[in-house]
Amino acid sequence: VRRLDGIVDVHSHNFPVLSAAQREVENSWLAANRFTGPPAPEWVADVALAFMDAHGIALQLLSMPTDVFAERAREINDRGAAVAAAKPDRFGFLATIPAAEPRRAVDEIRRAADELGADGFVMSTNTGGTYFGDPHYAPIFAELDRRHAPVFVHPSAPAGLELTACGRPGPVLEFVFDTPRTVVDAVFARVFENYPNMKMVLAHGGGALPAVWSRVAALGPLPWVPNPRAVTADDIKTQLAGLYFEMANAAHSVGPLLELTTADHILFGTDYPLSDMKVHEDYIRDLLNSTALDDTQFAAINASTLAVFPELGRRLSAVGAT
């Protein structure tokens, strides 16, 4: 019987305790993303630890993938660093990149890595409707590439959500499509060839990407598709196969993903504390029962995680947690 004993959760969120004014801003963001449920729960370390202990999770990488400006990113990252410093054997953090301001984003990447000891970085799938193939992101990707840094990509609402969501919350469907939207945009710009040292991890198994990548590879190179960089079907598959995939609420996508990439590109995450406990329990059960990964491959998930997040491995070794 499989168990999660000692696994690293690369997808969890440390939502802060908010003032009334901050909660109003948060609620505005939730409304813009068509969240119709309650606001995100405030994160409490002891409650998170109880969840982790109940499910065999050794450590969570905390992140806040909000589309914020530099000052807010600094606050988020300082808070994440403080949590990780207080319990370095149980929590790490991924620094928020203020992608709306590329030059200041580079400064924050440097500060978070060199001064705060971030285990990696996090960014949203788009910034005000601008996707990863846009030159807007070039300074950010160049700095991540220079550092051989991991970056966790979390879905966000697309521009024009009010026209496409059919009145439903963004996470129900539109988030699922925003990940392949930005990744495909990056592929046609040859982003992953231009920045080969950047390790990109896609949340939720890449959303709809496991279902659509072969269609993109088949149709993308056809003459009626805009393709100024002459990306071929092999180019598309090669770039996509180099990505990493975190599987929160996407256990049934493991099999299709293994037609694209290899088992060492599959990572574990929960999306805690979002959704509700039944969603977490069902997902973990489905992943443990999945036959897509054999026992050896499943047992190697942590080794894959530490290969993607080497700073985490070094820190855990320093505190005697590995």
Language-model features: locations:
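Mid-to-C-terminal alpha-helical segments outside catalytic/metal-binding sites
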Residues: V1-L59, D107-R111, M198, Y244, ...
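Short helix-capping segments at alpha-helix termini
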Residues: A85-D89, P223, T291-D294
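Aromatic-lined glycan-binding groove of carbohydrate-active enzymes
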Residues: F188-R190, N194-I236
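Active-site gating loops and adjacent loop-to-helix segments of metal-dependent hydrolytic enzymes
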Residues: L4, H13-E42, P158-T179, V216-L240
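Hydrophobic faces of well-ordered beta-strands that scaffold small-molecule active sites
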Residues: V8-S12, Q60-L62, G92-T96, F121-M123, ...
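Catalytic metal-binding/acid-base residues of hydrolase active sites
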Residues: H13, N126, S156-A157, G206, ...
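Active-site gating/metal-coordination segments in enzymes
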Residues: A58-A186
